[in-house]
Amino acid sequence: MKFACRAITRGRAEGEALVTKEYISFLGGIDKETGIVKEDCEIKGESVAGRILVFPGGKGSTVGSYVLLNLRKNGVAPKAIINKKTETIIAVGAAMAEIPLVEVRDEKFFEAVKTGDRVVVNADEGYVELIE
């Protein structure tokens, strides 16, 4: 299934989805050295490394942008990020770390996507796709 998206940062990625319905704070919420989610939420203990991170949006400190950059430098960044509504902190961090970042407004996408699903993010062509 394909869904339209709005590119915040450019690029293309394919990988396994890591999905939460909760907002994420990168500062304190994700370990910048390991990519493990530390925040008390449904994906606590999971690694964002090499996955398509799907969550409604960010929360928290402006330092979160630098956490995303450090995740990239440490080789544990997500391949791409999908939000419902992207805040500036996530956008700046994704741009600095060269991580494709898109917004999907279609609620059907968020109802359908589950952790472990194969997802293609194509910010350049404006779509995300759930691979069956």
Swiss-Prot record:
Q: Name one Pfam family in it.
A: AcnX_swivel_put
Q: Name one GO molecular function term.
A: hydro-lyase activity
What pathway does this protein act in?
Answer: Isoprenoid biosynthesis; isopentenyl diphosphate biosynthesis via mevalonate pathway
**What EC identifiers does the entry list?**
4.2.1.182
Per UniProt, which keywords does this protein have? Isoprene biosynthesis, Lyase
Catalysed reactions, as listed in the record: (R)-5-phosphomevalonate = (2E)-3-methyl-5-phosphooxypent-2-enoate + H2O
Is Kinase a UniProt keyword of this protein?
no
The record's CDD domains line, in alphabetical order, gives: AcnX_swivel
- Asked whether the UniProt record includes Lyase among its keywords, one would answer yes
Single GO biological process annotation from the record: isopentenyl diphosphate biosynthetic process, mevalonate pathway
Listed InterPro entries: PMDh-S-like (IPR012016), PMDh-S-like_dom (IPR002840), PMDh_S (IPR020794)
How does the record describe its quaternary structure?
A: Heterodimer composed of a large subunit (PMDh-L) and a small subunit (PMDh-S).
Q: What does this protein do?
A: Component of a hydro-lyase that catalyzes the dehydration of mevalonate 5-phosphate (MVA5P) to form trans-anhydromevalonate 5-phosphate (tAHMP). Involved in the archaeal mevalonate (MVA) pathway, which provides fundamental precursors for isoprenoid biosynthesis, such as isopentenyl diphosphate (IPP) and dimethylallyl diphosphate (DMAPP).
Q: Which NCBIfam families match?
A: PRK03955.1
Name of the protein in its database record: Phosphomevalonate dehydratase small subunit
Organism for this UniProt entry:
Archaeoglobus fulgidus (strain ATCC 49558 / DSM 4304 / JCM 9628 / NBRC 100126 / VC-16)
Per the UniProt record, the lineage of the source organism begins with: Archaea, Methanobacteriati, Methanobacteriota, Archaeoglobi, Archaeoglobales
